[in-house]
């Protein structure tokens, strides 16, 4: 758990460095301060949960996104989708749209990258999880089957549509919540990544 917590901190440090390069030193310092006072993130930093592992990879993808390293950002998110959390496709989708719109990558290059990383991640997760569960297994495929095809996600419990905005995000983000909203109006360079994350939450 200590190693996992250190990996979480290292991924946040990568975001801090990228934020400094993108938005300046004051923004990087504010990110450190906000990260230190957010209880939920630090509480789960060393817990062996899929969301914790996915969070590390997504933080690395965020740092790459801020630095304009599009291949690395897309590769990280693709791996996280296949191995840890399939719903991260909703975060990858707007990134791919932006990359194609601004012609950072061609569609062929994007598809080649996604297929290559996805295949490698699939081989890794099937090999590891099949070994430990002693049967052929792709965990995220089973989750999708249960939640989507069988439509049984409601068995985990349901919440109103506004729950993320009125309960989960305020508790998780604290002061960063209103600041993220303000950045849409005040920081044009932040809009793409904020809107992409907003799309992820809404959908």
Locations of regions flagged by a protein language model:
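Short acidic/glycine- and proline-prone juxtamembrane loop motifs at membrane-interface regions
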Residues: 43-53
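Short helix- or helix-capping micro-motifs
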Residues: 28-39, 63, 78-82
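Loop-to-helix entry region of an early transmembrane alpha helix in multi-pass inner-membrane enzymes
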Residues: 1-10, 44
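Extracytoplasmic catalytic-loop and juxtamembrane helix elements of membrane-embedded
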Residues: 106-115, 127-163
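Transmembrane-helix signature of polytopic, membrane-embedded enzymes
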Residues: 6-37, 195
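Perimembrane helix-loop-helix junctions
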Residues: 62-80, 87-122, 181-185
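Hydrophobic transmembrane alpha-helices
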Residues: 12-20, 39-42, 58-67, 94-102, ...
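Hydrophobic, aromatic-rich transmembrane alpha-helices
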Residues: 167-201
